[in-house]
């Protein structure tokens, strides 16, 4: 019954990959899943579905979850989605090679409340610049490759595999990987309605455990990543599998999924930048928007013991 009633939102980005991978592994191993993954194309639709109670949980931008809690939405962050897995891309024919070259240029970001926006803010700040020195344009990640190819924007940044798509198709180059600007970068988290935590804590724990196990499974063997790329891209993302294969292997640590327990210092760094950038209205206590009890129980959890190739 939980599969029918426990709906989890995700976007077709690698920041959310553990959501479909958990479902895929469980269905492959046991013939059934224990939650229903719901795919969205953009942040506005996903956010509205969560606020309308059409989702029990969702992968969501970390600053967006913090801001929603600040606005009175009863949610809790219970786990991380990933580490790293974001790049800033410029057109290969452009004269942009550093943040200094971005002055007066147009940069596409996924959302006002995205950590990609904070990466831009941090990079500008580290180079003695301000947000006002560039033009930020909000675009759904799937629309970014076409915008960069047509030179409608000068640079783009979002979760993968859309940055890799621009690289593979030959019209872009990497300006910066997220880890160069912000080591152990976090974009997205898993958020759950507080009511759901109170009413179905066992399903929330099962979900967090599954995500932890699938994340470690992905990081354990490059062949696991290649197998997941093929099936998840087709069945859940509706994308060319070569995109996920590229992102998950070149190099393998381009995005990682093992170190996903909640740590206060990570969110204090996000909060500090979000306050400076004007995303948050004011400070918000870590305990107010997180429930660390679920992630704490994943300490030492083993990856799924499954080899799809055998």
Would you name each region that the model predicts?
Residues 63-64, 94, 137, 142-237:
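Pocket-lining segment of extracytoplasmic ligand-binding domains
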Residues 60-67, 80-87, 231-234, 242-244, ...:
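Amphipathic, soluble alpha/beta structural segments
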Residues 68, 124, 166, 232-234, ...:
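Hydrophobic alpha-helix position signal
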Residues 1-130, 135-138, 154-160, 171-176, ...:
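Short, glycine-/small- and polar/acidic-enriched structural segments
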Residues 20, 41, 45, 49, ...:
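Extracytoplasmic/secreted proteins, especially bacterial periplasmic and envelope-associated proteins
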